[in-house]
């Protein structure tokens, strides 16, 4: 990955696959805004959540190719990578191992999120499961989880993983 410019590693910009960019036109405008703000590298992270955001992988990948073409129209030094914001579930590791969802730019990093009321024990178990299978979790929206807002010690534990 190039090391020039800012990185946006959590962006719902792939058109027509989740609650982010609703069209290629909107995605193009978002790319222009990102570029004007100094962003040169974007990891597009469409949602994956059972029974809510289950866009077929082929559709996500097709729309991502459209996004890459749009990025080149904005500027040749705007680099786009595919990732995923994965709402944690018990099948997560298996889905990642089977390539049913994307890691962050093909790395071992996984952007994962939880419901706001998720218990600390479940968050801990899911993160340790990822780690024990060679994945490196990035917890999205840390401010949303009640158990983390109430327990700074748990936040520190997660930071030390």
Residue locations for each model-derived region?
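Extended substrate/RNA-proximal surfaces in nucleic-acid metabolism proteins
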Residues: 54-161
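An N-terminally biased module of ancient metal coordination in phosphate/nucleic-acid-related enzymes
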Residues: 1-77, 156
């Amino acid at each position: 990955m190039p090391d020039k410019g800012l990185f946006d590693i959590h962006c719902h910009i792939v058109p027509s696959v989740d609650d982010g960019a609703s069209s290629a036109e909107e995605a193009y405008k978002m790319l222009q805004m990102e570029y004007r703000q100094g962003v040169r590298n974007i990891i597009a992270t469409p949602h994956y959540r059972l029974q809510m955001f289950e866009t077929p992988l082929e559709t996500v990948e097709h729309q991502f190719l459209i996004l890459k073409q749009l990025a080149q129209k904005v500027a040749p030094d705007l680099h786009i990578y595919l990732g995923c914001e994965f709402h944690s579930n018990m099948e997560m590791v298996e889905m990642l191992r089977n390539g049913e969802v994307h890691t962050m730019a093909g790395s071992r990093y996984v952007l994962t999120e939880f419901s706001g009321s998720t218990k600390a024990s479940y968050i801990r178990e899911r993160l340790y499961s990822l780690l024990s299978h060679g994945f490196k979790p990035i917890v999205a929206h840390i401010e949303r989880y009640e158990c983390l807002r109430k327990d700074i010690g748990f936040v520190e534990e997660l930071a030390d993983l």
